């Protein structure tokens, strides 16, 4: 049958010129338009391996320690919504270690950029609860319009925490598109009523204490 017919293909090797490769892609595109298949076979070492991004920052705080401190400060009625990637993994681990359960957690796994609006939705529909959104700088960058929307609504039981390491650490550590951006200034500019920039564990403990309702 047709499935056993020789499939048209092209072997890609370093000896090929850019023109030859371009012509090969043209043939492949034509075959696909005709509803046929086309395969590219890559010789060993055809692709060059680039050096892995070296992930470094000069932050004095460690994300896992910050997450642990936040979870330790929670009241039983509080809710945590965490963004995708390592933040949710560490929220899961620290909640397990500190509380022995995940009853307060909503882990936004696979929903990069959506944690803040999910947290806002919970806050709006459960005003008796305090909702902590643990966001990452890369995830927050995905849907920055949500900051302006949330600020306009002025929720009184919503705490938005951006853990900024200036990198997409979960997928290799490449820098985000806004290295050096002050997320605190962005939040202040769009209308967040109270904004804190935290650089030490002592500052974190103080702010977590100060923002609790009296």
Task: Give names to the regions the model predicted.
Residues 3-4:
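Short, small-residue-biased leader/transition segments that mark boundaries at the very start
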Residues 10-12, 40-42, 79-84, 106-110, ...:
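General beta-strand structural signal in soluble alpha/beta enzymes
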Residues 23, 50-55, 91-95, 144-145, ...:
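Short acidic, glycine/serine/threonine-rich loops at helix termini
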Residues 91, 176-189:
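Short, glycine/polar-rich helix-capping loops at beta-to-alpha or helix-loop-helix junctions
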Residues 8-54, 184-214:
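Structural signature of the thiamine diphosphate
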